Amino acid sequence: PSKSVSLGDIATASMFGHDIPLEVTETHMSPLSPPPYMVGAAEVEVDTETSEVKLLEFDACVDCGTPINPNLTRVQAEGGILQGIGMTLTENVTYDQRGWPMENSLMQYKIPTRVDVGRVRVEFENSYEPNGPFGAKSIGEVVINTPLPAISDAICNAIGTRFYELPITPEKIAMA
């Protein structure tokens, strides 16, 4: 007698009595990791009385190969730029004598919101990368790191002082 079991029965049996379902994962690893490129330009306004920095506009152009999902690529770029703006202007972690972070909630750890930044414009220079999946390159790191030099240079251009530690706070600007 021949016995057979359907794939559906196997899937159901694999989950019965288990909290974790059966899972299959596939990844792509290129032999080379071609770098993405990005250029960023920031326009800032520095209040000479309060030393507050207002980011009026941030423009960027990103070459991340061929975007596999253009909408998600744009959101990734805009979100990373916002993280880079926060790293540059507001985000700071300090520690108490025991080594515990003093900024233990979003009330103390200041991340920028949409009202804290002006216009953010991102364009893409599409290219085909033969070593990437479907012609794509990475995008995550380049969009976070580019706002720092652009904003820092804009502040230096406005007040004539270059800063070498982050974040560039109004207190640091006032003491410059």
Language-model features: where?
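C-terminal catalytic domains of large/alpha subunits in multi-subunit enzymes
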Residues: P1-A176
